[in-house]
Amino acid sequence: MSLIFIVILFSCNQTNKQRTIIDYLGQKPPTDTAELFAKGMISTSSLEHSAPVFSPDGKTVLWSIMKMPGYHMVILEMNYDNGKWSSSHSPSFSDTLANEVYPSFSPDGKHLYFSSDRIGAKNDTNAKGNRLWKAERTGKDWSIPVLLDTLISKGGEYACSISETGNLYFTFGAHRSPDWNILRSENDNGQYSSPLKLALNSTGYEDGPFVAPDERYLIFESDRQGSIGGSIDLFICFKNKDGQWSEPKNMGDKINRSSHERFARVSPDGKYLFFGSNRNQTEKQPGFDIFWINASIIEELRKNN
């Protein structure tokens, strides 16, 4: 009898998990045409500098912007409670004097990773440039952030993405250098291996990695050959049967234009792809807006790979 109860309880938990519905700020879901996301809430007159990242339970969304003058980067947060979204605010882990950007949830939603040039631990001798930090979700709040393993956080680390096994994909780029690369570090019981540069990197600029939770595909931005109009475009590669990445493929004109397309993130339910684009910028209003599109485009690209 107890075994039957356990099976029923497990089934109920799985059903509840599957029924988690995310309210994407009340926006009408997109089809296979990219649409502006949450005008006036996420896509505003500010300079958006990351895609929005939603927690798996749909209760929190974070993103980053650049404040003018000075291009000061800050992370913003909104929370869903009692059937409505809060106004945007600085999360409790923020250091408002630092440049902080590129928030990214772990697939289980228990941790948030971000890039910051805040001062590290006492007697920290490597405090130059942005490095990767991690905050733990504690109820509706956040823990005090901790600096990631020094094998990774040496200075010059920016966007990152985490697989369900804890493997870390991130960007390393020296200040003002045109050569930015995507690196991968394996997680072994909470300890990270020395980062390795992925073979998919070109001689130019690669940034903004998003890896699928099961590491089946990787989306990133690049100015490599094959970009539309010589701009920064989004590219995708798929994991082959031998465990190697396929040749990076331009994600096509449903996403990329002659403008810059950056900051790719897939929603935790796997339904939507978010990205930033400056296709709508004007002389009076420069910068990026956030767009979203049905994530079925990923499977379309896989079939044509």
Identify what each model region corresponds to.
Residues 1-18:
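Bacterial Sec-dependent N-terminal signal peptides
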Residues 16-305:
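Short, conserved micro-motifs composed of acidic
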